Regions:
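Conserved beta-strand signature within the Rossmann-like core of class I S-adenosyl-L-methionine
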Residues: 204-212
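Conserved SAM-binding loop of SAM-dependent methyltransferases across substrates and taxa
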Residues: 119-130
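A short acidic, Gly/Pro-enriched loop at the edge of an enzyme's catalytic core
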Residues: 167-177
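Conserved SAM-binding strand-loop segment of SAM-dependent methyltransferases
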Residues: 153-166
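Conserved class I S-adenosyl-L-methionine
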Residues: 108-116
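N-terminal auxiliary segments of SAM/dcSAM-dependent transferases
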Residues: 1-62
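A short glycine-rich, Lys/Arg-flanked "PGG" loop and its adjoining helix->strand segment in the class I
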Residues: 191-203
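Substrate-binding/catalytic lobe of Class I Rossmann-like enzymes that use SAM or dcSAM, i.e.
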Residues: 213-323
Length: 323
């Protein structure tokens, strides 16, 4: 990441805006099979998140949270000689989850919808507050893991883990939380995503989202392109801009973005921690059946993303939506 960060920081100068906008004419195009309709979304999610629960467990912390943590300044940074110690990362992930639940005003009796289950930590912590949680995922691996986690935590009766597309959700909810899910939705389906949230949100309800973001001009310059990260890591993915989110919410829902908080450097630190763990567990990753090409690609993917956040090319926001 230390090698890639200076390039990411100077991207606008290394690749001028006009040339960036021209990418749409010479870059490969997204295959039709990776469009995020109901069938494509299921395939895209499965190709990444159903690789192996054991793989993700080797570089995530004990909460199995695969999104940016929020670090406290008093939390000591993890060092290269202690990559397996996940206490500080787990604490930072729990801090992030609790902040999102607070933003959505989740409490005893709240009917909560989570769009994008992950491995279940947010659902379990919400249920521990007394909330009744419905959480949806397209990953069978994640569904099985999250059900088991809820049972082990003693809140299985409060957590319903459904294998559904977000567009198929029914019911009415006091709160909706979705963590780094919008990036997998696809630009043409962002209106559907927010319209679904608006449709199921009860009067007086609150929405808390966490999303990776990119500057709006960069979004316009790169939308429709098909890069190595789409081909090998995140098929169907695209990162929104804060401007795009505000615009789509305003034109497709009764909601409004009432607050937005950025903390991109926390994501750089989170990714650095994941990369160190991945390096430390390379032999264990390969023992699961993943070859050297895969491990080198994933190390580059994690370093590439760390550089994006460390340089400011990428950011991450927590958003609150209300009517």
């Amino acid at each position: 990441a230390s090698v890639l960060t200076p390039f990411a920081r100077r991207m606008a100068r290394l690749v001028p805006g006009g040339l960036q906008r021209a990418r749409r004419w010479y870059d490969a195009r997204q295959p039709a099979s990776e469009h995020n309709d109901l069938r494509g979304s299921k395939s895209n999610i499965s190709r990444h998140y159903d690789l192996s629960n054991e793989l993700f467990a080797l570089f995530l912390d004990r909460t199995m949270t695969y999104s940016s943590a929020i670090w406290d300044d008093a939390t000591p940074a993890e060092t290269d000689d202690s990559p397996r110690d996940d206490d500080t990362l787990a604490a930072a992930q729990i801090r992030k989850i609790d902040r999102l639940l607070d933003l959505a005003a989740v409490k005893d009796g709240t009917r909560l919808l989570e769009i994008g289950t992950g491995w279940g930590e947010l659902a379990v912590r919400a249920a521990s507050r007394g909330a009744n949680v419905t959480t949806v995922t397209l990953s069978r691996e994640q569904q099985a893991w999250a059900i088991r986690r809820a049972e082990l935590a003693g809140v299985g009766d409060l957590v319903d883990v459904q294998l559904h597309d977000y567009r198929e959700v029914t019911g009415s909810y006091d709160a909706v939380v979705s963590v780094e899910m919008i990036e997998a939705v696809g630009l043409e389906y962002w209106p559907d995503y927010f319209a679904t949230i608006d449709r199921v949100l009860a009067p007086g309800g609150r929405v808390a989202l966490q999303s990776i973001t990119i500057e709006h001009q960069r979004l316009l310059a790169t939308k429709g392109t098909y890069t190595w990260i789409h081909k090998y890591v995140f098929p169907g993915g695209i990162i929104p801009s804060l401007h795009a989110v505000r615009d789509i919410v305003a034109h497709n829902t009764r909601l409004r973005v009432s607050s937005a908080t950025a903390y991109g450097h926390d994501y750089a630190r989170t990714l650095h921690s994941w990369l160190e763990r991945f390096h430390a567990n390379t032999a264990a990753v390969q023992a699961l059946g993943f070859d050297e090409r895969f491990t080198r690609m994933w190390k580059f993917y994690l370093a590439y993303c760390e550089a994006g956040f460390a340089s400011g090319y990428l950011d991450v926001h927590q958003l609150v939506l209300e009517r």
